[in-house]
Amino acid sequence: MSRYEVDGVDIQTLPKVSLHDHLDGGLRPQTILELGDEIGLELPASDAASLGAWFAAQSNSGSLPEYLKTFDITTAVMQTEHGLHRVAKEFVLDLAEDGVIYGEIRWAPEQHLQRGLTLDAAVEAVQAGVEEAIGLVASHGGRIRIGQLVSAMRHLDRADEIAQLALRHRDRGAVGFDIAGPEDGFPASRLQSAFDTLAKAHFPATVHAGEGAGIDSIADALYSARALRLGHGTRIAEDIVVEEETDEAIVVRLGQLAEWVKDRQITLEVSPSSNLQTGTIAQWGTALTDHPVDLLHQLGFCVTVNPDNRLQSGTTLTRELGLLVEAFEWDLDDLEQVTQNAAAGAFCSFDEYEELADEIADGFDDLR
């Protein structure tokens, strides 16, 4: 049993959907030690507990660029077919253990070519690990559905190539495209031709926006990338003015961009703990209770809750939901709403969505 409960229900037992979860941010510390030993990688700690603590400490810098430096270690042990296969398999098994029934794994294949893998071989290795894990979950009476989000690094110049990679694997595990890396100064419009290619092929994209940069970045992601979801999207709150707040009600005025995102129900992939670590919510405060996620949720935005990087944040989706229950007194209805939001935003077929939505509703009803 987890320590996180809502209305007397263990949150870990609830069906969950994870949309924003980085493969190179979800390694088990013991796996890093073992894979690192195989390649002679020098690590900052020699046991799993200490290594996990090191990642958490390094990630609490309040700076997105500093936070991203921790990935130098995780990607170093993910440069072979064996390493990628193992990491992907364990990643999915850990999701299933946490109650996730549908998950999308985002990762950037271009960061995993240092030991001779091709882009396609890297994607195939991850897919093989995913499929092995799905089979293991099924053999124990469970079920989990997983898709790959193939990411391009926004500050590099391979987006067109990575977009074509995603399209080659659209029927072999890839369900969507993403751009990641430093957001500020690297708008989606830099990669316009890649997004044009994807749009012409009717392939969905989510874009990291509203994390390391503000509403101009969000607007650009929606316009240039035709983003169906916003990775984090937290800083859309910069376009909301609170005009009056009492114990009974809150009166706000939405700017045109915020109104568009709300009215079109564009999915916000909010990652609360990560947002604290990277300073995303610094303008509102430094505690989780300062995070605009509750305001966005109460106003009817399509909020979803995600772990982002389970290793760096020392977290799980259960924990992220539990923290919001503690901070904002969310109840089962709130958790079901954000979970259904995630199902609606998932890059799957409409038939798969309907099945997923029913499974979520039944799962919550059974625990009420």
Residue ranges and their predicted role:
Residues M1-F203, E211-R229, R235-R368:
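Metal-cofactor-binding active-site regions of metalloenzymes
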